Amino acid sequence: MVKVQKPQPKSLNKSASIEGVVKKKGKPEKTKKLATDATLELASNKKAKNAAPVKKDAIKKEPEVSKKGAEKKQSKAAKRPLILAPPESPAAPAPAAKKSKAKPAASGAPVGKKIEAKKPLILAPPESPVPPKKQEKKTKAAPVKAKKEPAPAKKSVQDPVPSIKKVPAAKKSGQTAALTKKTAKTEKQAAPAKPAKAQPASQLQKKAKAVQKLSKPASPPKSKKALSKSKPGQAKGNAVNKEPAKSKKPVELTFELKAFDEKRFHEIVNENNVTKVCAALKSVVSEEVEKKKNTSIFSDYRYVLQVCSYKIPSCPKRMVKLNLKHSLVGKDDDVALIVPDLQRGAKFDYDPTKQHYEDMLREAGVKQRLTVVPFNQLRNEMGSFEAKRKFLNSYDYLLCDGRLSGQATAFLGKNTQKPRNVLHSLRLSKDNDKLPQEVTRALTRTAFRQLSKGDLIAVPVGNHEITAEQLAENILLVIKQLQEVYPGGLANIRSMYLKIDITGTSALPLYVSMCAPPEDVPYVVGPREQRMLKLKKQANEVLSKFAMTKDAEFIKLTSDQVKRKAQLRKEKAALLAADAAPKDNDGGDAAVPAKKARKESSSEGAKADAESDEEEEVEEAEDSAGESGDEDEEGHDGDDTDEDEDEDDDDDNEDGDDDEDEDDDEEDDDEEDDDDDDDEE
């Protein structure tokens, strides 16, 4: 398809661009129309702005409008600058409202006059400079006429009139007139919305007062006042400032706390007082348990001794086991006994081992009902965590052969670290006569967990079937053992309370200490640390029989050298004690150096001595080795006694050499002592 352009618009418009010509032709026509329309609109706007004051003048000068119709055009044009000022005065909205009342009050004739006045106003723009002078004279004469007398009844219209006359007296410049025109628009638009509120100022003030009286009891103003008086930020600040004023000062002790007295402790915690407390607790607990029988499934419970300490000890985590006089196990309680297998291995059946130990207990005359559990059965059936926990919770008391106690606790896990689930060990020996005693001893035991976190421990001391006297005996035996086992001893005990292991029950005090707490934090050496210290001591004893050369080779010392080394140690310790004694007895306030500084100073001197002693010791060892080799070649026996005799003869002949050797040995011993001390530190 071929596109064809129409040539007619190009030939008609006589221009290079069709669209441009059309737009150019349209623009002048629109501008002309806009110019004429704009003039009309501007004129109408000016009329609308000046309509209100014109109407006021029309109301005042009704007879003049009727007589002189031709002069109205000129008079209105002349009054424009005088009428533009009132909109800025505060009384400007009042006259706008009065127009609405003036309209119904006037007759039909003035309304017609107003309409006639609007028509000639459209032709107002062409103004001549000559008529305004004549109009100004007329305006000056206008207030002289003051035709307010024909309408005396219209007080609402006449009262605010003088305020309007006073405002035009102050004439403003052309710049202020432009601003008043803009403000006049907004005021005149709002004026027709308030026709009914046009009232004198006195009445408006009265109404405003009445509104204020009604608004006083309302709640919103109260809230505002409260907010203005006290802001939320200020209120918080005041509250914070008042808190320290209210807080009481710490109570200062005016007396000194006495040190712990063990005799006084035993006077308070005696058998008579403990039995009274136990009897009172049993009577109180029986009532509380009856109330809680509906909620709890089991009726059995245990008595617990709660011990609170002054200072939390530094001790390893472990289960401490104590002996009791009367067993915690009741008649109907279930007790499990973990025993080793007769044949080790997961494939072997564990029924023969079970039958073997049951027969052995029956023959020995053990009266307590025990459930034998071979360790092979434990490994096969209790593999998961839930199964292990269920096994431990299904028994009231757990016994284990001493050969398996460590292995069984490691297998069952952390659930055995509770006083109720602890594995109490016993010895299953072949002697049937001692087996019942061993079982009763294992059943009369209790345990508590020792920690380095809290200051409270709970020790089970009895069950619900036990009497008050038996409970008191168990408590006294436990307190006697706590004196040795508890970290810090009895002096570190703040209080002791007796209660049962059911939550929500009461507790009775056995002992409350008012003594001064211990100065030092108690430190407990656990069984593992004791074993390590024992091994260290043995290692030091073995190393004391050897000496090290420069080439890092150990040389074994003779028996005489070891003895001499031990004597030198004792002498050295005595000298150190003698040096330290006068310093302590001086009584002066001399500053004692820190432990670290003392160690450094002593170690520096020891190192210097050690270097010289090591060289001499190595030379001696080499010389002694060479002498022994020569003697063997000559045919003498290699016994130590012969060597000692030869050495003694040589010492008699050569006193100087002997003295040197002794000095060397002493220096060697000093070096070894220093080395041992460093190792121990």
UniProtKB/Swiss-Prot annotation:
Residues 54-74, 599-610 have a biased composition (Basic and acidic residues). Keywords: Phosphoprotein. Residues 1-248, 579-681 are annotated as: Disordered. CDD domains: Ribosomal_L1. The modification Phosphoserine is found at S15, S17, S89, S128. The keyword S-adenosyl-L-methionine does not apply. Residues 103-112, 189-217 have a biased composition (Low complexity). Residues 611-681 have a biased composition (Acidic residues). The keyword Secreted does not apply. Gene3D superfamilies: 3.30.190.20. Coiled coil: none annotated. Belongs to the universal ribosomal protein uL1 family. Highly divergent. This is Ribosomal L1 domain-containing protein CG13096.
